[in-house]
Amino acid sequence: MEGVYSAEAVIDNGRFGTRTIRFETGRLARQATGSATAYLDDETMVLSATTVSKRPKEALDFFPLTVDVEERMYAAGRIPGSFFRREGRPSEDAILTCRLIDRPLRPSFQKGLRNEIQIVATVLALHPDHLYDVIAINAASMSTQLAGLPFSGPIGGVRVALVEGQWVAFPTHSELANATFDMVVAGRVLDNGDVAIMMVEAESTPHTLRLVAEGAIGPNEQTVAEGLEAAKPFIKVLCRAQQTVAEAAGKPPGEYPIFIDYQDDAYAAVEEAIHDELAAALTIADKQEREAELDRVKALVAEKLAEDFEGREKELAAAFRALTRKLVRERIVKDGVRIDGRGVKDIRSLTAEVNVIPRVHGSALFERGETQILGITTLNMLRMEQTIDTLNPERTKRYMHNYNFPPYSTGETGRVGAPKRREIGHGALAERALVPVLPSREEFPYAIRQVSEAIGSNGSTSMGSVCASTMSLMAAGVPLKDMVAGIAMGLIYEDGKYVTLTDILGAEDAYGDMDFKVAGTRDLITALQLDTKLDGIPAEVLASALQQARGARLAILDVMSEAINRPAEISPHAPRILTVKVPIDKIGEVIGPKGKMINSIQDETGAEITIEDDGTIYIGATDGPSAEAARDAINSIANPTMPEVGERYLGTVVKTTAFGAFVSLLPGKDGLLHISQIRKMHGGQRIENVEDVISIGEKIHVEVRDIDERGKLSLVPVEVIEAEAVAAPNGGESPNGAKKTDASGNGAKQPRRRRRTRSSSRSSENT
């Protein structure tokens, strides 16, 4: 087609086959500033459109970039499950993909750009075994590269998974089931041909610990470094294909005004006016005292320079920030001393405590310096797990991790309510760190909700959430396979020298060159997140940072272990859940016609019952006896002990007829009490209507007299048997007036078999 340009990137995964990523432009969304379509094996298709406002937002002091991901359910051949049957607010998967796109693209735009830029990636088609997020990264980069913006792309994004000892690019869901580590890496190609890693999002899989126990390669520090190197050739191929399309169809660079933060004279004036006061303020260890002094010094700038720089107040504020950044970095690189007086490898003071909130199922408080995280765990029936209506093949989510960041955590006012993208991203990171150590559904049949409350913040609340959540889960009785801790690392690069910082503060995050978060057990990395502002980080520097993070992680785990080192007993306030396995062909009997049987069991025991398609039944109740009563009732139906002749039961009359009454002995097992036996209960008198002497719901002790070849039960009242037994030795008469005799008619007493008495599980609950 005329005006349509395309290029392919072929990814060779050896014995795992090849993946073909095709970039195309000129066919769809032609009115956007830049548009591109990315295909994965011609089965998955993502359209990205980049648009730019005509005029800059001069009043803004930040870059107004917006990234949106639109999941269309038709991409998977489905209709949305909402009431209106159309897509609504973005799913968590879509929001996390927005963040994956934003993080490498935002620093690639020229600093000072103030035109609004919007990137919209729409998932148009999705193979059920594919993941669309990395395709969206490449599509967004391609459309932005074509738009003629001041953009230092292209950016290549690739997911690599460690499967059977090999790093596989663009793995499928089925391949990830056999992977021990999963990494999304984004970067760009430098002029020297090397690849600058700009963003990493990595995690162990739910199967990692099992696979490692079976002999697979575990995700340790060396493995992660190798994975980053393995991703670089794939990124090169992707960037080369994008560049081919951009050279053929890209718009010429447009003229966009660049707003610099300050002029040189403003910086020089600020430095001369308050250099010494600012340097002294930055040596104050306490955050609140330091910020109060910084506010005073900042006010001093306005006082001294306002007249000379009238109308340029924003420049003075920007120059003040730039000078602060310079002084913080100089002190770290030259003296090895940080803002709060620590060395580069020092961790702030740590505090760990469990059971800090009454009545909740599990709670913990983790403090690292001024960062303070509350972890709260709630357990419930599996039917309470989250139902997911997204393009992800997983339809339910058993472990739910929510992260809250209220404005008071930093001593500020602000909006509270629905979670922002940052909160969703931090919660997802903490969730990924913990999923590999969670017990399976079979081992622990509970839905688990974990909430992290960041009630105090000065750096790395997401990693603090991992620590607090680990302790909270163990306090709730969740049998974690191992304890997990997290640490945030930073990096300063000045004059060819790299300095790695352990346990960074919020200010060090803002003024540093890298934010590097690592979570894991003593032996394995379970989650990792990296964002860098540099063109690239040497492999040896990254490997050193990983080792430094491991030492800090082990120190934190030691403190956590002092608070709790093994799972506690499940809280008395948490529901008790039992599991019963029944044959699949018995599920219908347990449910009963129109749910009659299962509703009856739930009503009588107070338990909640969930039935899986494979015959697994989960029983939840507020106390153990109720759950056990429900389990006994289910077993009596699906795994019954058949009544035998001579056994006695406390039964319940469930039906009356002209010839007698049917008595329920066990759920689903009724027997006939013939009218002749009912007559004996009433002195042998004639009975016109059974309903006159016996009513539905009445309790009656009966004995199984006979079981015919069809399994039908004939019953006799225990009181009749006992009356006959008393009358027989004295030659007396039975209740119907006839003398009791043996088979020969001589009236001799016959030996009776030993009887056992049972009560029906349904009726015994009411006695």
Curated annotation (Swiss-Prot):
It is found in: Cytoplasm. Gene3D superfamilies: GHMP Kinase, N-terminal domain (3.30.230.70), K Homology domain, type 1 (3.30.1370.10), Nucleic acid-binding proteins (2.40.50.140). It catalyses: RNA(n+1) + phosphate = RNA(n) + a ribonucleoside 5'-diphosphate. Residues 725-767 are annotated as: Disordered. Mg(2+) binds at residues 509, 515. Its main location: cytoplasm. It comes from Thermobifida fusca (strain YX). Transmembrane segments: none annotated. The keyword RNA-binding applies. GO terms for molecular function: 3'-5'-RNA exonuclease activity; magnesium ion binding; polyribonucleotide nucleotidyltransferase activity; RNA binding. Residues 750-759 have a biased composition (Basic residues). HAMAP family: PNPase. The keyword GTP-binding does not apply. It is an enzyme of class 2 (transferase). It comes from the Bacteria. Residues 575-634 form the KH domain. PANTHER family: POLYRIBONUCLEOTIDE NUCLEOTIDYLTRANSFERASE, POLYRIBONUCLEOTIDE NUCLEOTIDYLTRANSFERASE 1, MITOCHONDRIAL. Belongs to the polyribonucleotide nucleotidyltransferase family. Keywords: Cytoplasm, Magnesium, Metal-binding, Nucleotidyltransferase, RNA-binding, Transferase. PROSITE patterns: KH_TYPE_1, S1. Pfam families: KH_1 (PF00013), PNPase (PF03726), RNase_PH (PF01138), RNase_PH_C (PF03725), S1 (PF00575). This is Polyribonucleotide nucleotidyltransferase. Its EC number is 2.7.7.8. SUPFAM superfamilies: Eukaryotic type KH-domain (KH-domain type I), Polynucleotide phosphorylase/guanosine pentaphosphate synthase (PNPase/GPSI), domain 3, Ribonuclease PH domain 2-like, Ribosomal protein S5 domain 2-like.
